[in-house]
Amino acid sequence: MSLINIHNASLSFSNLQILEKSTFHINKNERVCLIGKNGAGKSTLLKIINKKQDLDEGQIIYKKNTTTAYLEQNNPKNLNISIYDFIALGLKEHEKNKKKHTNEIVKIEKIIELIKLNKNTLLSHLSGGLLRKVALGRVLVREPDILLLDEPTNHLDMKTIKWLETFLKKFSGSILFVSHDRNFIQNVSTRIIDLDRGKLVSWPGDYENFIKLKNESYRIEKIQKQLFDKNLEKEEQWIRKGIKARSTRNEGRVKKLKILQKEQKDYKKIEKINNIEINQSKNYLGKIIFKLDNIDFLVNNKIIIKNFSSIIQHGDKLALIGDNGCGKSTLIKIIIGENKPQKGKIYIGKGLKISYFDQNRSFLNPNKSIIENIDYGKEKILLNSREQHIIRYLKNFLFKPNQLKSLVKTLSGGECNRLLLAQLFLKPSNVLILDEPTNDLDLDTLQLLEKIIIAYKGTVIIVSHDKTFIKNTAKKCWFFEKNGFINTHFSQYDSLKKEKNNFHKEKIQKNKSKINLAIKIKNNFKKELNAILYEIETIELDIKTLQKKVNEPDFFKKTLEEKLPTLKMLAQKERKLGKKILFWEKLEKNIINTKI
């Protein structure tokens, strides 16, 4: 039996249909990714499963004694509490009587050890990424059968995302998570459920396979809709000509027409953002946009940036990459003049028009409407010297005319980011600065944003932890190391292996007195590296074969005894792969640190 079964579920808010006679299930040991457009109802579905939202119709059946734990999309707001006490609140017994039983203390200490943070630290002292990690700890302490995670990678840096991927793969229960991080989905999910226009559709396989199948289904749907429209038009022409004789055949045709007209009325068209322009300014002078000479920046005597020099040229597509709190947003503020360095000089090019996407959404007024947040609510806007009605412009960002007077504070995270992009793209610019633009955006909007950045003729500076987004947009990377050092890499971000290799490349110092010995040691490491890479490739092939079996449509219909050997073997191979990768990383580090 499945852990959870949802049957014929329907739910609507005002005119928005969230679920329409939808059915799906979650089996034991599944890691299911819930995908859908912004505002489709993904977070609502998690709340339904967590018993925080009722259905209008249908039923949800839980296997006896099944427990759930829910990680919300937003970080905690009450920050005047220690990490220990916050995680302890995840235990229902602790919430009821506040008694710290030995068993509870062991559970809490175990989670704190897992997230590797000081239990006495107040939440108010943590970054957004660390708050996310602590919120996850509060969920995990309950040891649920099903983890419900809403955008778990938001605010997390690459290192923490990798930690989360590893943890979730080892998690003994089932997971239903919402995410738009394509690399994370590809690495973690065993199945994908798509919430599309009120319907829940289960897709076998991984994310890349899902995209192929989804695009094909859209193509087929469009063809079917064209044939439907032609048939409807034909029947309506027939009825307009008048019915000459009352006959059973004619009555049947009239009934058929009414059915077709109802289907036409009920049809929900595919909504995609596909017609967005950006207001590009051409009034720039010279090739150099920003020049940084020997920049030092400290906060409370802590070195954030040390002796950094570089040049940003016109047309650069630059990504800033590093852990949370390493100074990426600080450097952006130095570049645009909001922060002054303690040492060094900054040259800013002439004629620059900068559009800045702020991850905190500080440019949106939450107490004003959608339309009031765009060009002061003017009826007509100017886009690349062409006048356009504000309603038409916002329609391109999937905002319907009847919702334009809605206050910004009522919007979802993804809708806020779409509005911020609408605001940003209207402002004439030749420099785009995007600080965490991918948070909460659905996959269609992400892919369109990538196309806009690629086609943009000006300069783009990106801060993001989304590997796929960086790989698809950036042509140049700055890697933030410890102690304020920044390494520049003048080519595309490709993979984590390449990142790690290039991240440390400039550290290698040549030592002529020990060169022969160093070369010999390095060659030995390389031989070991080649051997371990072969083992990794072999294990990955085994995992791929096993995953194909697991992703077969009938696999989860088998009995537990039939499924268990395959699932156990897959888990063993994944654990083995993890160990081999750790050994590979150690060898790479040895090679990098061997000075020649």
UniProtKB/Swiss-Prot annotation:
GO BP terms in the entry: DNA repair
Coiled-coil stretches noted in the UniProt entry, renumbered to this chain: none
Gene Ontology terms, MF aspect: ATP binding; ATP hydrolysis activity; DNA binding; ribosome binding
Broad class of the protein's primary localization: cytoplasm
Summary of the function given for this chain in its UniProt record: Probably plays a role in ribosome assembly or function. May be involved in resolution of branched DNA intermediates that result from template switching in postreplication gaps. Binds DNA and has ATPase activity.
PANTHER family xrefs: ABC TRANSPORTER ATP-BINDING SUBUNIT (PTHR42855), ABC TRANSPORTER DOMAIN-CONTAINING PROTEIN (PTHR42855:SF1)
Full protein name: ATP-binding protein Uup
